[in-house]
Amino acid sequence: MAVSVSKQYMTSLVVILLFISLSSLSPTSTSHSCDPVEEEEEASSFGYVCHSNLQKCHTFAILRAKPPFYSLSDLSRHLGLDADDEYVPKGQLLLIPIECRCNGSIYEASLIKNCVKGDTFRSVSQSLQGLTTCLSIREKNPHISEDKLGDNIKLRLAIRCSCPQEGVSNASFLVTYPVGVRDSVSSLAVRFNTTEDAIVSANNKSGVVPLKPALIPLDHKPEKQGSRKRNPSKKKRSKMKLMIAVSSAIAGVCGLVTLMVFGYLHWKKETQIQTQTQKWISNKDPETRQLSLSIRTTSDKKISFEGSQDGSILDSHNTVGTTTPRKPVLEIYAFEELEKATENFSSSNHIKGSVYFGSLKGKDLAIKQVNADEMKRFDFGLLNDQSHYYNHNVIRVLGTCFREIDQDSYLVFEYARNGSLWDWIQNKLAIKNQFIESCYCFLAWKQRIKICHDVAIALKYMHRINYVHGNIKSRNIFLNEDLRGKVGNFGMSKCVTNELATEENLIESSLSPASDIFAYGIIVMEVLSGQTPDMLLGLQEVETTSLGTQETFVSEWSRLRRLLGDKEKLREVMDSTLGESYSVDSAFEIASIARDCTAEEAESRPSAVEIAERVSRLVDDDEDEEDEAVIDRESTLISESSYKPLVKKSSIID
């Protein structure tokens, strides 16, 4: 009896201890992305303690041009900065003016971050490259749940900064700079035209720490190269105002009659367009009819907006205002406008297939003719997300032109000046005779890596909104004037009617995010080798009904994937035009990504998020190496971009 009770007691005790152990291992619902261990250092160790003689100052912070901050407009959109006050060296460093204030005992500058879907406290801090910390963001926003970050959420940020101490430093500005892995005190002194002693003194007699901010002392205000001063004298301003007033009066009198006449003609034309459009929409499906609620004619602004859910945003003083955030909608063009833009759809403006080049109001466009069935199957619902309009890596749909039921309609896309990726890696530009003869049309290794990164970012965006592209290939990757990649055919996955076998549907038949990933792996192979997979395998395009060819393809494909996993044999498939001007380690990592993406089992392939992170690390490594080269030949903050458009016209939809 006693033995039985003892066994029951021991069994219960073991169960209780096991429960407690498992409970301690399980994650809590209040977990955050911040890691306190990584940010345990005090701000004072980096020289940010307030000085009693200076409570605030105007200074600057620096960001490197990388996602999500590519340009001036990115900073203005994400951080709410005034575009006219930003100093942006294209492709190099972004210089941000800030007001540094003493908050308690520590200097900091306040900014507001406009969140997007997928943001976390950690991702925001990482995007700012050490100017703030994950824990600081969480402390400054105690009432905002990290799990609910998304569009229209405003985060308050405390940017690290400092003011020069009178009598101690001769510097007029202490610029906050994110230290890179390859930065050193000596290299920073050369880049910013200062001394090593001044940098060490400004940072509490210590050196610089990679991936942490450092203070760079400058004795003058950084200025944009070639900038023009905008400080005319009072006399000049008065004269300018008088000239404007006189010109306005004359223009008003002379244009009154003209305005009345053309106003009537324009109203009549607009009425005809809207009547024709509504007639077309009334015969379509409910989703297309819903789009009519967002349609504006060309007499309106390029971007119109609709209200958000909360109906409030922060104004310039960071207070809640009544202005309603809005979403971009499509523009509707009259058929006569497209005729004029394309010179009556002349052969000289024909790009390929049903796509024409057009120029309207000084803007280059790609205009695609589509039949009624294609227009009906176009996924207009994707365009309701404002992130589509601001996405740098997707060819944007700008507008439409609806015609009669029995006539073809048109989709209007942004125009990519430098053709498709296929044109470049297959060296077809010479055949098209659309390149500048003095230029050698060739993609360098670093440019190829950046294009792979751009496509990965586009896939990450599309899969985040649960959209499967279904037609990812080098012919549908286009290059803008800066040779950055943009994915075409967005919204047309239901319009694809290709009957020929492709590499991915020889292995699997259903469309899914994994099939897009497979297609991405094929593009990476083309970038590496300068050849199509068919050329690498020694095969030709065949009909999908050929079972023997399918078995041969799968066998040869497995052999090619094994080749990508061998660093020595990889040289055999590298594009010969690259010569030795590429990193073997970088090429092997890209080949590994291609190999992982084309795994036979869909569940074994990485996600678009994983791919973007892996390629991003390669881009960062290349940029760090390039920074070292820039230091040797430049001593200023700002340099001009050397990229030039090489192609006159390019297709948007293949």
From Swiss-Prot:
Residues 227-238 have a biased composition (Basic residues). Pfam families: LysM (PF01476), PK_Tyr_Ser-Thr (PF07714). GO terms for cellular component: plasma membrane. It is found in: Cell membrane. Glycans are attached at N103, N170, N193, N204. Keywords: ATP-binding, Cell membrane, Disulfide bond, Glycoprotein, Membrane, Nucleotide-binding, Repeat, Signal, Transferase, Transmembrane, Transmembrane helix. The keyword Magnesium does not apply. Residues 1-25 form the signal peptide. The protein kinase domain is predicted to be catalytically inactive. Belongs to the protein kinase superfamily. Ser/Thr protein kinase family. This is Protein LYK2. The gene is LYK2.
